[in-house]
Amino acid sequence: MSKKIDRTGEEKLNNFGSKMIISRYNGALDIDIYFPEYDWTSENKKYQHFKNGKINCPYEPRVYGKGYLGEGIYKKSKNGKLNKYYISWCNMLKRCYDPKLQEKEPSYKGCEVEKEFLNFQIFSEWFYKNYYEVPGERMELDKDILCKGNKIYSRDKCIFVPQRINSLFVKRSNDRGKDPIGMSQNSEGNYRVRCRDGYGKRNYLGIYSSKEDAFRVYKEHKERIIKEVIDSYEGKIPEPHYSRLREAMYNYKVEMND
């Protein structure tokens, strides 16, 4: 009679590099695997999967080295198609932790995701409570309309907005170079002022000899456009999101170094 094998205590790294320890062995088809780094146990697994490193832990930061799926009801896909809230979560992490994207879009350098939002389950629950749609428009996750200059994606600072609203606050510092926002200096040293309207069209606002006068014209025009755009969404954006956006956008102050 052969001696029964007990592989309890056997260790191995999985394909992500996490340490695994067999904490219970009841034959090759029924083992429990402990992940000490995350204090989590995967139950009723096969020994062969352990040997091949194919056992995953839901707390491993597999998305841009930060985000993890966690445990809960929210899944990354359904019927082979990625869920909308998973795509939104991944895009948020990409903006904060993908160096290649930040080289193309420097405004995201220094941005972070709050600890809770690194957990896909928590983000997804927040998504379901706060996501809405405006017919015919693409929705985007914003972090700094409610709080100008904010660099952290968090539950209290983030809000979904139509792309038309979000585009009002896009910083195009790469395009304008060293010139202050809304203006460009011509060969004679004067300042030409242009500002996009609420539909993305760039309007010409004149030429001014001083930077201060040019900025004053741009600031007044831009702040008026911001108010007009949010007013146009009354009845289209549900409450309380509309009131929060309206308050923030009515109080938004354009600054020369934006």
What are these model-predicted stretches?
Residues 1-42, 58-90, 94, 110-113:
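Short helix-coil boundary/hinge micro-motifs
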Residues 33, 123, 183, 193, ...:
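An aromatic-rich alpha-helical recognition segment common to small helix-rich domains
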Residues 39-42, 200-204:
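Surface-exposed loop/edge segments in extracytoplasmic proteins
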Residues 46-66, 165, 174, 225-258:
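Extended, polar beta-sheet/loop recognition surfaces of beta-rich domains
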Residues 109-115, 201-211:
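A short, exposed loop/beta-hairpin motif centered on an aromatic-Gly-Thr core
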